[in-house]
Amino acid sequence: MLVPRRVKWRKSHAPKRKGFAKGGTRINFGEYGIQAIEHGYVTNRQIESARIAITRHVKRGGKVWINIFPDRPLTKKPAETRQGSGKGSPESWVANVKPGRVMFELNFPNEKTAIEALTRAAHKLPMKCKIVSREAGDF
């Protein structure tokens, strides 16, 4: 699982869900990628689940790049607890993803297999995504 090694503060403010991605909107390493269409938080478990979906479908011969990292703690209060008495304890780590962000990249010689692998990974993510390629743009 992806988690930060060290953080300056145990809890943080909730990230804003507005605006568009400033960087990371183009494919840098691979030939194909998954691009976010809407805002959302992606947890470390969802990132790992999408990575496994890609690697199991392409088996060998492909390379996967993960361009997002869960650097924000998500806090939650215990069940059946009254409101008040401070913020809840950190439960998981999330990456704040804005529209236009390329989250995963894949380099694989067969286009049909690469698109199918990325489609399977996109189903694991909590927001609407589209598959993009380096030359053609989106599919």
Curated annotation (Swiss-Prot):
GO MF assignments: rRNA binding; structural constituent of ribosome; tRNA binding
GO aspect biological process, one term: translation
Source superkingdom: Bacteria
Keywords for the protein's UniProt record, in alphabetical order: Ribonucleoprotein, Ribosomal protein, RNA-binding, rRNA-binding, tRNA-binding
Membrane-spanning ranges: none
Database matches in CDD domains: Ribosomal_L16_L10e
Matching InterPro entries: Ribosomal_uL16, Ribosomal_uL16_bact-type, Ribosomal_uL16_CS, Ribosomal_uL16_dom, Ribosomal_uL16_sf
Region described as Disordered: spans on this chain: 74-94
GO cellular component, one term: cytosolic large ribosomal subunit
HAMAP family: Ribosomal_uL16 (MF_01342)
Complexes and interactors: Part of the 50S ribosomal subunit.
Purpose: Binds 23S rRNA and is also seen to make contacts with the A and possibly P site tRNAs.
Record family assignment: Belongs to the universal ribosomal protein uL16 family.
Protein name: Large ribosomal subunit protein uL16
Native source organism of the sequence: Saccharopolyspora erythraea (strain ATCC 11635 / DSM 40517 / JCM 4748 / NBRC 13426 / NCIMB 8594 / NRRL 2338)
